[in-house]
Amino acid sequence: MAGWELLKLLLDDVQEHSTLIGKVWLTVLFIFRIFILSVAGESVWTDEQSDFICNTQQPGCTNVCYDQAFPISHVRYWVLQFLFVSTPTLIYLGHMVYLSKKEEKERQKENESRILVANEAQTEVHSSATKKIRIQGPLMCTYTTSVVFKSIFEAGFLLGQWYIYGFVMSPIFVCERIPCKHKVECFVSRPMEKTIFIIFMLVVSLISLLLNLMELIHLSFKCFQHGIKEGATCSPTGIPFNGAGNRMPPQEYTNPPSSNQDIDLPSYNKMSGGHNWSRIQMEQQVNGLVKPKCQCDCWSQSAISVVVSGAPGIISNMDAVKSNHQTSSKQQYV
């Protein structure tokens, strides 16, 4: 019983760092396996070999038939199943303790570098480092692997029990094996009680397997949801995504304020050709409103505009520019 108590204490530590389904699984493991096996299992199978009676006087025949009927005792088989199923959980516990100690050492190094931190605050940090560890990263991989192996062991032991014993305890077992000279009938004590106990343990194993499968689905959904949250901030194309996975609309782009805000550039209409522009530029030159830098900008704008409007308009506009220049200058000085 001391071994059971030690294992129970270890699994209690695992329960603090498990999911909700994992806690239910551990509860089922404690109540319906450890307690039932320790209290009722041994009492049901105590007379298993002593009350196994065969209708023969052949020496050694009864022992051989019992070995054929029960290659391993049901209670020992269930204890072995319990140990195999609990082993991945204990490995997860070891990994968790290792990570907690590692985090505790890192916190100690950080606290040693801080002189102003009080000793009470350090003890609070140390106590919280071993009790509050989130299941993520390598710990999540270890936890998921332990659940997978628990499911494999549960299914394997269920198949093994069906192959070795079946799920019903027959009251009569027919044996034909050396040194028995003929077929021997052997009688099992309390077959109905043992059948009920076998079915009960079968249901517990099925519930445990179902909980493991549900926990795998829960962990898969949790990892998938975590991946969506990580990919919500950016996408391969550089367009941000929202929480629902839809692309967010691009932000409107506003031109930065220009350094030459005091210069009013003339507007140009492409439909009016080059006459309108030449008249405006001549007026600005006469009145002295255009700066040298603006003239360069205007000439560059006029060159682009003339090219856009077409090369044939250049020749026809040259005479008009000269005549407009002469008339505008005369009218200004008169």
Swiss-Prot record:
Task: List the Pfam families hit by this protein, alphabetically.
Answer: Connexin
Q: Which GO terms describe its cellular component?
A: connexin complex
Q: Which residues cross the membrane?
A: 13-35, 76-98, 154-176, 208-230
Expression across tissues = Resides primarily in the ovary, oocytes and early embryos.
| InterPro entries attached to this UniProt entry | Connexin, Connexin_CCC, Connexin_CS, Connexin_N, Connexin_N_sf
One function term, GO molecular function aspect: gap junction channel activity
Claim: Hydrolase is one of the keywords in the record: no
* Biological process per Gene Ontology, one example term: cell-cell signaling
Subcellular location field: Cell membrane; Cell junction, Gap junction
Relate the protein's function as given in its record.
One gap junction consists of a cluster of closely packed pairs of transmembrane channels, the connexons, through which materials of low MW diffuse from one cell to a neighboring cell.
Note the subunit structure: A connexon is composed of a hexamer of connexins.
Family that this chain belongs to: Belongs to the connexin family. Alpha-type (group II) subfamily.
Q: What is this protein called?
A: Gap junction alpha-2 protein
